[in-house]
Amino acid sequence: SSQSRGLGDVYKRQGLTDVEKAAERLADALTTNQRILIVGDYDADGATSVALCKLALTAMGAEQVDFLVPDRFQFGYGLSLEIVALAQSKSPDLIVTVDNGISSLEGVAAANELGIDVVITDHHLPGSELPPAYAIVNPNRRDCEFASKSMAGVGVAYYLMSWLRHTSVSYTHLTLPTTLVV
């Protein structure tokens, strides 16, 4: 049927602003054994995003990858100041947000002040100002030419992990299992 779609119909990674920069930062974290903290939202999209990134990064050799899925009613939504304080107790070198972060100006600034790089992956609509993150992967950025603007957060996380897997072939330090789907 005309509704039937296959893997050949998946959007290409090109045009997704900052995906290459984010993947390069993650590759650096992997090759230098840095501590990576994934911060997700506690809904289904956030939980699947966290699981995808944790599994993919571990499969690509990350030895120090942890995650945090805070209760938004206790800590607020996104990378809030409270969540940055909680994250600091895990001593990350890099925070990767999944399904949140696009409106976290104060939280990202606080993480930066602590010397923690932040990579944001999100699908929510950005405000007039973007957070001062190392990289922001969001198809709804005004400067993003990605083919789809209607993707869940886990889709954005998937494209980042896919780009990391694709570009990491040139990193001989990384063990890349052939069973990894991304």
Regions found by a protein language model. Give the residues of each.
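Short, conserved micro-motifs enriched in small and acidic residues
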Residues: S1, D43-T48, A147-G155
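Single conserved hydrophobic/aromatic residue that forms the stacking wall/gate
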Residues: S1-Y11, H173-V182
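Glycine-centered small-residue hotspots that permit tight backbone geometry or close packing
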Residues: G6, G78, G101, G153-G155
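Conserved protein kinase catalytic domain
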Residues: Y11, K54, Y158-M161
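N-terminal small/polar loop signature for handling phosphorylated ligands or for N-terminal nucleophile
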Residues: T17-E129, I136-V137
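A structured phosphate/pyrophosphate-recognition subdomain
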Residues: Q34, L130-L174
